[in-house]
Amino acid sequence: MRNTMNLTNLLAPWLDCPELADITVQSLELDSRQVKQGDTFVAIVGHVVDGRQYIEKAIEQGANAVIAQSCQQYPPGLVRYQQNVVIVYLEKLDEKLSQLAGRLYQHPEMSLIGVTGTNGKTTITQLIAQWLELAGQKAAVMGTTGNGFLNALQPAANTTGNAVEIQKTLADLQQQGAKATALEVSSHGLVQGRVKALQFAAGVFTNLSRDHLDYHGTMEAYAKAKMTLFTEHQCQHAIINLDDEVGAQWFQELQQGVGVSLFPQDASVKALWASSVAYAESGITIEFDGCFGQGRLHAPLIGEFNATNLLLALATLLALGVDKQALLDSAASLRPVLGRMELFQVNSKAKVVVDYAHTPDALEKALQALRVHCTGHLWAIFGCGGDRDKGKRPMMAEIAERLADHVVLTDDNPRSEDPAMIVQDMLAGLTRGDSAVVEHDRFSALQYALDNAQADDIILLAGKGHEDYQVLKHQTVHYSDRESAQQLLGISS
């Protein structure tokens, strides 16, 4: 049963308003279109939309009260009425939202693990949840591929939901028996305070490379946003990738840091490192050493960065006290994440690997990872998103030309931009104009590659991963790389 609280108690940390005790808050809602009879509407000033413009609409929808961000006309602490509905104004409401929602949903008590970084967040959160389930502990995830238990994920609009959604979802998950939840924590989510009131048992840093500069402006601002997971949330354990330049620097600054590396470290360093890594078609075998002792594991994942992902997940769970032998014994039962280095293969045709790689660093790592598994030619099919960072377009084309034997440029959510102009930006990164084929339709691009590839080739279909849509100028249409691979290879879904 959902928790309720009277408005006086809900606002107690910021406002003394005993006259509002007879108003019951049962659900907070940020979107006026979603307000139902008896909901409390929260009107914040967002980065795009000012929720205060929709107060009247929320009241018409049945809001029983409104909590709004203050302004010069309506200062902090003001209580007024509109159509007999109370409106209370708070200063910097956007920064208080996480705590406000936490009070209503009683700050769900479970082990929270926050994972931040440019790449690897989804894989690591899902590996952590899988491993905990295999160890007998009910665990959930929140992130790009959805929220909830792995066998019943509910779609998510953003990597990190809004502050109210997060607290509401955690309360629901706790009610369903979750003992731990692994959350993808995006830089946007950190800057906008969406996880401000959460206390993390562990935080994980994967890596930092070019992404979201259209939002943050500089790499320095992007890095600073990520760092706040460890400096402002009292993480008991900070699991840091030492093989990343930024991670190595942060490790020196964080007292609670546990390092992770694919390379041997000095015994005095508080870290877990690989003493040997073997890659095969059946997966990755890692022997490790360090502050948690020695061990060996095998998991059916492919690619060097998945070796790092495995060790980051392992170090996190060991730091939280999960039995080491139970983790090593169950590693072979771990499964790849949908759309993350996901292999589709049949006899007599090239292998197709679907991956979410949509940044220069991710594309480079994906191609490098597949090269060690590839006995024939390596193909790269990818595009770049419209209305996003244009600077990465030539960079990604240069990487593909350098690391793949064949390059096919295609569309990936062109949005309001002309797809041909996006491709022109990518072509600028090539040293030879004829080193890439252009096919705007993704299905046709994969069909072209399969028609021209040999059986021992590997085709990387990058950019969409788990997504099942293509965002065009005036509409969003259904499209899935995974479904395309299955259809063209004749694999039943």
Curated annotation (Swiss-Prot):
Cited Gene3D superfamilies: Mur ligase, C-terminal domain, Mur-like, catalytic domain, MurE/MurF, N-terminal domain
Positions of UDP-N-acetyl-alpha-D-muramoyl-L-alanyl-D-glutamate binding: 30, 32, 158-160, 186, 192, 194
Catalysed reactions, semicolon-separated: UDP-N-acetyl-alpha-D-muramoyl-L-alanyl-D-glutamate + meso-2,6-diaminopimelate + ATP = UDP-N-acetyl-alpha-D-muramoyl-L-alanyl-gamma-D-glutamyl-meso-2,6-diaminopimelate + ADP + phosphate + H(+)
Cofactors named for this entry: Mg(2+)
Post-translation changes: Carboxylation is probably crucial for Mg(2+) binding and, consequently, for the gamma-phosphate positioning of ATP.
A single MF term (Gene Ontology): ATP binding
GO biological process: one example: cell wall organization
Motif position, Meso-diaminopimelate recognition motif: 412-415
Pfam families for the chain: Mur_ligase (PF01225), Mur_ligase_C (PF02875), Mur_ligase_M (PF08245)
Its EC number(s): 6.3.2.13
Pathways involved: Cell wall biogenesis; peptidoglycan biosynthesis
Binding of meso-2,6-diaminopimelate, residues: 388, 412-415, 463, 467
InterPro entries: Mur-like_cat_sf, Mur_ligase_C, Mur_ligase_C_dom_sf, Mur_ligase_cen, Mur_ligase_N, MurE/MurF_N, UDP-N-AcMur-Glu-dNH2Pim_ligase
Keyword line: ATP-binding, Cell cycle, Cell division, Cell shape, Cell wall biogenesis/degradation, Cytoplasm, Ligase, Magnesium, Nucleotide-binding, Peptidoglycan synthesis
Compartments where located: Cytoplasm
N6-carboxylysine, modified sites: 226
Gene Ontology cellular component terms for the protein in this record: cytoplasm
Function: Catalyzes the addition of meso-diaminopimelic acid to the nucleotide precursor UDP-N-acetylmuramoyl-L-alanyl-D-glutamate (UMAG) in the biosynthesis of bacterial cell-wall peptidoglycan.
Entries under NCBIfam families matching the protein: murE, PRK00139.1-1, PRK00139.1-2, PRK00139.1-4
Family the UniProt entry places it in: Belongs to the MurCDEF family. MurE subfamily.
Protein's name in the database: UDP-N-acetylmuramoyl-L-alanyl-D-glutamate--2,6-diaminopimelate ligase
Species classification: Bacteria, Pseudomonadati, Pseudomonadota, Gammaproteobacteria, Vibrionales
